[in-house]
Amino acid sequence: EVKQGEIVALLGRNGMGKSTTIKSICGLMSEFQGEINFNNTSLINLPSYKIAQLGIGLVPEGRRAFSNLTVLENLVASAVEGEWDLVSIYNLFPKLEERKNQLASSLSGGEQQMLVIGRALMTNPKLLILDEATEGLSPTIRVEIWKVIEILKNKNVSILIIDKSLKQLLDLADKFYILEKGKTVWNGPSKKLTSTIAQKFLGV
């Protein structure tokens, strides 16, 4: 469950169902058990584009920018009118404005990740999902992405996040769910996620 303005983190060792959960929410998995509801609407059997139209924005694992489009074309491709527009995205990521006429394929890995986050925000989502948004990035870019996530939190953006950076998650997330073999084995607020629990379920 993710409430308005909350950051909720999914934790678990590799292969325990975190990304599968994300894919199921976004309509990218055809077979799973259980119910998924968003704003009182069942997401079961809905195509992914319909789920996006309901207000779920996904930043997928692996920096999937549209490589044959420019930065600007990427940002406006699926834009929805709202608070997040080109001006606000460029304020968040000044490098994107500098590179707006370049092809996405010419950007560095960190810049591509900024672009994918910006593109998701341009849909003005009610829920933003970040799947390993800082993985494989340089330490400097990771710091920048975490600062952006903090800004989004302060702007009351609802976020569901998967990330291996437990320290940053403990600072920012309101609530945690720990998954093991596709099932929730622990959930609670960050202040109750003790080192004992982390060691038991996460090995950290």
Predicted regions and their residues:
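Conserved ABC ATPase signature
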Residues: 103-107, 111
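The feature captures the beta-strand-to-loop junction immediately N-terminal to the Walker
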Residues: 11-13
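ABC ATPase NBD coupling module
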Residues: 30, 42-63, 86, 98-101, ...
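Helix-to-loop junction immediately C-terminal to a conserved catalytic motif
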Residues: 26
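ABC ATPase C-loop
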Residues: 120-121
